Amino acid sequence: MKAKEYLRTIQKLESETKECYGQAEYLKNAINNLSNQNAIETVEELIVDLMDEASDYAIHRVHLINELLNVDDPMQYTLLHYRYCLDYSWHKIAYKLKASVGFVKNLHGEALKSLDRYLEDCCNAEKE
């Protein structure tokens, strides 16, 4: 898996988690309009399933985020975290890092290379 794909997976897991929570919240509100006990129990089971699914997505996302700590330097990790976990713009990242947008974009390229190397090393280690 390449760095960009890895980082998109982190973003997708966040989206999936939010989607599950949103669906569960919608169903919680819909229960109030139901009178059939069997229907209520079915919806309650769906809510539990959605919350379990959201939890699984969140746990997987945390594991992937923790692996970002293996990039070459803490500033690269911080940049990747801001960009792909917190969805910050380039300008906001530059402001937070007290750097220019150009510097941040260059650092981003280096961080992607570092993450690619780490992911390649992991992949090679698994093959051995």
Annotate each language-model stretch with its function.
Residues 56, 73-74, 89:
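Alpha-helical structural elements of signaling/regulatory helical domains
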Residues 73, 85, 113, 117-120:
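Alpha-helix capping at helix-to-loop junctions
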Residues 1-68, 120-128:
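N-terminal interaction/assembly modules
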Residues 81-88:
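Short helix-capping/turn signature of helix-turn-helix
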Residues 80, 92-94:
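Hydrophobic positions on the alpha-helical face of helix-turn-helix-like DNA-binding modules
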